[in-house]
Every structure is written in C-alpha cells, then in structure tokens.
C-alpha cells in the first residue's frame, strides 16, 4: 500500500471523522485480495444509514461518521476491523474534540457509538449476510458479541468508578471491599464447609477435638455423617435409582455445602423462632429449602459467568459443547411432547432451569429430606461428669415428634416438630458467634433499586418489598411504571447509602456485662430461674400451687433463653463488624411503604443495645448548635419525665449532671453508674462518652461527632390524623401547634379521664353502679394507665382491646383483690378512656370511621382495598382467606398454606385505617430522606424517628417540617375517594367527613412537632 493510499485514521485523513482525532495507530488488518466482502460491507453501511437514521434519532453530524465514500473505512482497498465501540472514545485510542460540537450533541453521538446506532447497524448487517454473503455471518456475530460484552463491561466499570467517587474511596480500597463483599455473599457456606473439612483432618492427625468450643464441636460431630448421607442420596440419583422428585435439586450443590447449610439453618431457626427448643417441621423445612434454592441460584449464576469468561478466552470451544447439549435436550423434549408425556417434560425443564423460583412444594420436600437426614445422623453425648456409669450416654441430638395444637381455631390438630436435646438447646445460646449469616451489613454501598428484585445485595436474593406471599401486591409492584416508583427507589437508596460503624467503647462495656452474666442495663440474665422443688405433701392445694410455680418458672426460662439467643446474635454481628471503617444497611419496605434495614440482627431499628453500639461512620464537627443538641439528646435518652421538659429545661438537666456524665464515660462499670438509670442506658452511655470528649477539648465545637441525634414525632399517628382532618384541638394535643413546652397527649387524656371519673364518683351508686368503680380508680389514673390505649387508638383499637390493655396495667399494681374486680374496673376504665379520646380527637375518629366504611363496602364485594401513596407506591392489603395444600415429604405430610381469592372482610376493614396512616408516615420519611440527601445532610430513620449529626439537626428540623406541610398540601382524602370511585364505579361511597380550619403552616414554627 503506497503512502498515497494511506487508509483512514492516519494523520492526513482525520478530517473525515471530525469528532475524533487519533492518539494511537489503530489496528488494520492486511488486505485480502480474494475476499469478496467489500461490496457487502458497503451495502451494509448505506442501508444502516438510510434505514436507521430517522428511527434512531441520530444527528446529522453523527450520520456523517458512517458516510460511504472513496476514503471510507469500507474502501475496496482494505479490510478494516472495527475498533470496539462499546466503551468511551478516549479509552480506545480516540479522544473527543469538545470544540467541534456542543456537549449535548456530542453526548448523543457518543451514545450512538456505544450502543444504539451499533445495534441498528448490525441488525441490518445480519439481514444482509443472510441475503448476499453467508460466509461473513461468523464475523458479524463476533462483532455483535464483542460489542455487547464490551458495553456491559464498560457500564459496570463506569458504575463502580462513580461509586468510588461518590463515597470518597480510592480505587484499590473500593475494589478490595468489593471483593470481600462478594465473598461474604457467595462463599460463606463454602468457607464453613472447608473449615469443617480442615478441622476433621486436624482432629484425625492431632486429636484437636477437645480444644474446640462446645458448639463448634457439635457442628463438627454432625457434619461428616450428614455429608455422607447427602452424598449417598446424590449417588443414588446419578445411578438412576432414586425416583424422588427432590433428588435432582439436591444434586446441584456439593454434599459438604448442603450439610453446612442444613445444620446452620436449623440451629438458626431454633435460635430465632424456636419455642422451648423445638420448631414446626413445616417452618424449618421451608427455611432450609429456601436457603438451598438461594445457594443454587448464586452458584448457577457464578458458574455461567465463569464459563462465559472461559469461553471468551478459549475461543468458544466449551460453548459449542454446551450448544450440542442444548440441541440434544431440545430434541428429547420434542419427542416427549409428541408422545404427550407432559409430566416428564415438566420434570426435565424443572431440573434444567434453576433461575426460576422454586414452588413451595419443592422447598418443603428438599428441606424435609435434609432435616430427616440430620435427625438420623446427628447425636450428642453427655459430658463425662454427668454420666451415671462408664458407658457413654449417646443419644439423638434432634427428635421428630408431634404436638397437639391449642386454641379455638386449631384445637386438637396435630403438627410435627423437631425438638432438640436440652444439651443442644443450652449450646444454642453460645452459637451466635459461629453462625453463618450471609445477610450482613454491606462493606460497599448497596446496589441502587431499579425493580422488584433488582437492588441492594450484589448476589443475595433481594426484594424491594416484603410481600409474604401476597400475589396481588407483588403483581401491582411489578406492573407499576419505573418512573412512578423512582421517588421510592431514590428514598431507599438514600437510606442505604448512610455509613455506619461500631462504637467500640460501648461494645466493650456490653461485652463485659454479658461475660459477667448480664442482668444489667436491661440485658437478660444469663442464668435460669431455679425450678421449685416438689413439696413433700399430698395436699392438693399445695401441689396445685407448686405446679403453677413450676409452669411460671419454665415460662420465664423459655423467655430468657430466646432473649439470650437474640442477644448473642446481635453481639456476634457487632464483633464481626467492629474493625470495619464503615458499613451500610440496604433497605427495603413492607407493603405499606415503611422502610426497614434488611440485615436482621444488629440494626438501628433494634433495641437500645443495638442503637448504643452503632454510630455514624462519618464524623462531623459539632458546632455550637450541635453541642446544644447533643446535650438535649442526652436528656431525651435519660427520660423519666425529663424528656417532657422544654428544650431549655432539658439542656439545664444535662448541665446539672456533668460530673455524673464524666464519671459514666470514664468508669462506666466501676464508678457511680449514673448512665444505668437512663431509660435507654447504652445510648445514654454513648452520648456521655461523646459529650465528655467534646467538653474536655479546648475547642468543643470542632470535635467530630458520630452520634445520631434523634428527632421523634409526638404520637405520630395522631399527628397525621390531625393534619388530614385539619383538626385544631387535636393538633394542639400532638404539637402541630407551637407551645412553651411539649404537649403530652397521654397526660392530656389521663386528665380528661380523671375529670369524667370524678363526676361519676359523686353520683349515687344505687342509680349509677359504676360510681363505686370510679371511686376506686381515682387514685389509679395516670398517663401510664392510658398510654397504650391512646397509642393504639390510631390502629383502631376496639373496646375489648382497650379493656385488656388497662386490665394488664391494673394487675401490675396489685391494688385490686380478685380477678372479677379487676375485670369490672378495666371495663369501666376502657369506656371512659375511649370516650376521652373521641372527645379530644373528633376529626381523627370521624376519618377512621370513614376509612372503615369505605373498606367494608369494597371488601363486601370480595375485592381488596388498594391505594397509591403520595410517592406513587401501589399498596394492596394482603388479607385473604388461607387455603391449605397437603404435600407428602419423606419426613411427614406437610400442610402448606396459600392465599385464596376470598378476602377477609373484617380484617380488610379494621386494618385499613392504620395501614393508610402508616403509608403516609412512610411517605413523609422518604420525602425527608431525599430532601436531606440533596441538602448534604446525613439521614437515618426509624418510622417516626429521624436521625442526623448534631451539627445538622437544625437543617433536619426545617426539612422535615417543610415536607410534612408539602405532603398534606395535597388533596389526599379527595384523591383516595376518587381512586375508589374509579376502581369501583358501581359502588356508592360515603361523602368525606367534615374537616376543620387548621392552617398547616403553623407546623413550620412548632418546636415540639418533632423533638
């Protein structure tokens, strides 16, 4: 080739591609004199331009890139191999000339190059190959595949680079954390199995078993026999000797991994959902089956990815083999279809498709078989000091037995349970640190939500909503346009992007208390209550009392056992995460749109212990305002009435206890332990430590604070009702209107109840029998007596519910004699309390009744109540009659529940008012979260409690008030009624209840609305 014929892209020819200039010499293949491909390529280019330009909305400048000319890349004088167009130009030997075109125009051109135009172009190429030159088809296919792969790789690289920039990480650090996160999600079971294999080897060679912790020795003892039993099942299936429908599912994972999953899942279920050391077979089987399904799905995905990478490197040899296998399978299926053997076809398809969710029957059968094998192979031996003779006391670790259901609905029905040996049960309390927990806090920011099952964890199954099998809700969510759900996606992403870390100083104190036996700072006692000895008597009364005491002691011990297991799991997560600089909590939501962190054990939605050991990973300078809010926050956590003072009163409380605060920080367990008197002791301790550090600094305002400061709603459900009804009286009671100090709605109701009872007490008992009860209750009425009833009034609490709540409070006080007297007093007090609530919150009660009437009308037509939240989330109430399906498993016949088409009218009616209000408080939190992100304010939230750094509390307070006013400036009730009328045009709905004249903007100036 002469210099005069220098091909395109060399220096003297760059004018043809005026958007790009060369940086490196491109790869150009040698001319092939016998090739007949050049006319075909020229044809393709012309057709691509003429047929695709309009459809793809390509600018004229971009179309110039592909003009066929004597100097074109399709010149007859050379064969040009395309540069990879799937990545940005600057990454493939070209750079942009920003002066040539406007930024917007070039972005369109670049987009065309990186996918849109290429797809239109190559689709035409494929058509042309079919009609003119079949020999070129592999080259076109190769081009297509390479472009697709490169685009996908570049998209992933771009996303990861954005994440690194967004979260302030260097590339190497981010990649290391990413790899660790992938391992946590995909290799935990494999790692545990490898550890057991290694321990078995060490035990055989060095006899290390006695040195293992008790729980780990149990797992190790069960691992090998269970693994061998599973391997035997797998071998029978491979030899064609097993006809069980679950067999091919068990053959998709190694036996050692299945063994580990089965052991840990059953033990985990006993820890979290067990009742006195036993779990229902149906629940345990579905839990184990679900875990196996998820692991198969992850492994299948990773295997496909690995094979794809290997095929790319090996030139597709393995891919050809795979194609042959697929072709063979297709022929076999077609033959069976012709013979009408559809059941055989179904089994083949099920056994070769592991991406689709399993049906409930399969999960139950797989889980039941694995539990059956564990029950058969797992044994336990009593410690030597507990054996009566020289023979070892070896017995099954688990027993499959049956219990009889109690209660009016299922009385007399038997159900299967797996019951663990008392020694296993004792070990459960210490097994948290050895539990395999894939759903941990994430080391990298969660994937952004983009669909029902797209977001959060990198590999673990993640759903944006916990539907609990509610089909209509799931379908409504999947069918909603993505644009409609974008505000919800953004809010959940915002909550998931908050960085957390473990407060090591608080965790150290927690560990010291726990290792010393607990029973401090609301931690459960690690010891059991001793069972009373049987009295040496035949007196029936004494024996009856003894039996009652034994039953009570066992109940207490059972509750303590559950609490100890729960605490152990929380501390296990805290210990695993304590050395991480930062971690993240991916969030999803319930069907009403309330957000929840997905990791189940240690999260900020949990107890005081959880909140005390968690803090923001990012520290921000306190500033003068932040120091003030930190002091107020400490008073709020101390509570005991202090939290009902004005903000200045709370500030004074903290400043009057500085010596106690310093002592708590310096000597939390050796000093006066003032922090233990707080209502939330561990959170109080965390603030004591932070405040001490700040006040001892020469410049307290510059000290970095990691403590989340809470701003809590005042009986938030009633706040939403007051805003809906524009109810001035109700608004004053729940702090929508400004006051000198916070209004206490519970004290307000208690005062009204006391006024009514005083009037009743003055009446003649012969005319009004309740007068005697009123007189006896006068000294019992306080905010605690009525608090639960007021709180649950927003949930539509009934008279019976209120009566039972007040009855429990009265029994705690022991001022009443027999059960009959307590019951009568509770009946009277419940009526008076509900009357006082009706009087104070007339608008709220009217709206509640309207909600109930509308729901009843809809449900009476056997329709579910559904609505769309202000953020665009479709909500469908899931209350349907449950049907049962009997599934025969290898262990027993299980009764699986499933949703029927018949709605539960009463449940649809009673649940609608609280569910609708919860959907509104969820919307308020999400709106606040997104606004905080845009304002640069760190945000975390727990329903009606909003958290941020001390320095940003003032900003948060402005934002949350503005968003509340914005939310209720919408015609929410009008929109709801309109949606009902559009969905059910044949039904008549009652008119909207009358509303008051409250100006919602007063919320903007109310200091105690959230405080």
Swiss-Prot record:
<dbReference type="GO" id="GO:0009507">
    <property type="term" value="C:chloroplast"/>
</dbReference>
<dbReference type="Pfam" id="PF00940">
    <property type="entry name" value="RNA_pol"/>
</dbReference>
<protein>
    <recommendedName>
        <fullName>DNA-directed RNA polymerase 2, chloroplastic/mitochondrial</fullName>
        <ecNumber>2.7.7.6</ecNumber>
    </recommendedName>
</protein>
<dbReference type="InterPro" id="IPR002092">
    <property type="entry name" value="DNA-dir_Rpol_phage-type"/>
</dbReference>
<dbReference type="GO" id="GO:0000428">
    <property type="term" value="C:DNA-directed RNA polymerase complex"/>
</dbReference>
<feature type="active site">
    <location>
        <position position="787"/>
    </location>
</feature>
<keyword id="KW-0496">Mitochondrion</keyword>
<comment type="similarity">
    <text>Belongs to the phage and mitochondrial RNA polymerase family.</text>
</comment>
<keyword id="KW-0548">Nucleotidyltransferase</keyword>
<dbReference type="InterPro" id="IPR029262">
    <property type="entry name" value="RPOL_N"/>
</dbReference>
<dbReference type="GO" id="GO:0003677">
    <property type="term" value="F:DNA binding"/>
</dbReference>
<comment type="function">
    <text>DNA-dependent RNA polymerase catalyzes the transcription of DNA into RNA using the four ribonucleoside triphosphates as substrates.</text>
</comment>
<feature type="active site">
    <location>
        <position position="712"/>
    </location>
</feature>
<feature type="active site">
    <location>
        <position position="944"/>
    </location>
</feature>
<dbReference type="GO" id="GO:0006351">
    <property type="term" value="P:DNA-templated transcription"/>
</dbReference>
<keyword id="KW-0809">Transit peptide</keyword>
<dbReference type="Pfam" id="PF14700">
    <property type="entry name" value="RPOL_N"/>
</dbReference>
<dbReference type="InterPro" id="IPR043502">
    <property type="entry name" value="DNA/RNA_pol_sf"/>
</dbReference>
<keyword id="KW-0804">Transcription</keyword>
<dbReference type="GO" id="GO:0005739">
    <property type="term" value="C:mitochondrion"/>
</dbReference>
<dbReference type="InterPro" id="IPR046950">
    <property type="entry name" value="DNA-dir_Rpol_C_phage-type"/>
</dbReference>
<dbReference type="InterPro" id="IPR024075">
    <property type="entry name" value="DNA-dir_RNA_pol_helix_hairp_sf"/>
</dbReference>
<feature type="region of interest" description="Disordered">
    <location>
        <begin position="307"/>
        <end position="326"/>
    </location>
</feature>
<keyword id="KW-0150">Chloroplast</keyword>
<keyword id="KW-0808">Transferase</keyword>
<keyword id="KW-0240">DNA-directed RNA polymerase</keyword>
<dbReference type="GO" id="GO:0003899">
    <property type="term" value="F:DNA-directed RNA polymerase activity"/>
</dbReference>
<keyword id="KW-0934">Plastid</keyword>
<dbReference type="InterPro" id="IPR037159">
    <property type="entry name" value="RNA_POL_N_sf"/>
</dbReference>
<comment type="subunit">
    <text>Interacts with NIP1 and NIP2.</text>
</comment>
